[in-house]
Amino acid sequence: MTCSIESAANGTSRNRLVWIVLCSLALLAWIPTVQQSVQMPLIPGTMGMRLGAFLLFWAVMMVAMMLPAFAPTLSFHLNVAGQQTPRSFISVRIALILSGYLCIWLLFGLPVFWLAQLSAYLAYAAPQNAIYFGMALLLCAGLYQFTPLAAYCLACCNPKLTTHAHMHKAPDYHKYSPVHDLRSGVLHGLYCLGACGGFMLILIPFGLMSLFWMIVITLVIFCEKVWQHGQTLSYLVASGLIFLSLLAWAIPSLLPGLHLG
C-alpha cells in the first residue's frame, strides 16, 4: 500500500513537472512569435526570410504551438517508462524526449519553406494559380484527416484514445537510456506530425505570420490531444477546411497569405 501511494505521488509530481516545463517553454516562445507576427507584413511566402532564418522562426513557433498539446503524451510516457528512473534524471529525460520530438518538427519546416516559396512565386507570376494552390493545400489537409493514417497517429498522440501499445514494445523500456529517450521523442514527433502536419500547411494560404490562425490551430491541436472526442473534432475541422477550399474559389480573399496586398 505504501509503495502504491508513493508511486502515485511520484506520478503526480512528474505530471506537474511536465506541464510546468512545457507550458513555460511555450509561453516564452509565444513572445517572439507574437512580436514577429505583429512586426512583419502578411505577404506570400516566407516574408523575405532565407532558409536559416525561417527554420529558426519555425522552431520557435513549433515550441509555442505544439508543446502544451504534447504534455499529456509526455506525462503518460514518463509515468509508464519512468517508474524506476531517479528523480534527478526526470528533467534530463524530458529534455532528451523534447529534443527528438522537436527535431521532427524542425525537419518538417523544410517542405513548408519550399511550399511557401512556391506560393510566393505563384502569387507574383500567376495570381490565379496561387489561389488554386492554396485551395489544393486546404483540400488536401482536410481530406487527409479522414485517412486511417491520420486517425492512427492521433490515437497515438491522445492518451484517452489509445493504450499506447507502441510504447510497451520498446526494448529495455524500464531502463534509463538516453538513446531510447531520443528515439521515443522522434517516434512521438512522427506520430504528432502524422496527426497534425496538415493543419500546419494551411498557414501557407492563410499567412505564415497570421497570429489569428496560429492561435486557432494551437487550440484545435490541443483539444484534439487532450479531449476524449478529439477524433470527432478532427473530422469537424477537416470538413471545415474542405468547405473553405471550395468557398475560396468564389471568394479568393479568404486566402490572405496568397495576395500581394
Please state what every model-predicted region is.
Residues L74-G82, F146-A151, V220-Q228:
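C-terminal ends of transmembrane helices
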Residues A8, L55-L102:
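Juxtamembrane transmembrane-helix termini in multi-pass membrane transport proteins
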Residues S24-M40:
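Alpha-helical transmembrane segments of multi-pass membrane proteins
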Residues T2-R14, V38-L51, Y121-L137, L143-L190, ...:
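Alpha-helical multi-pass membrane helix bundles of inner-membrane/thylakoid proteins
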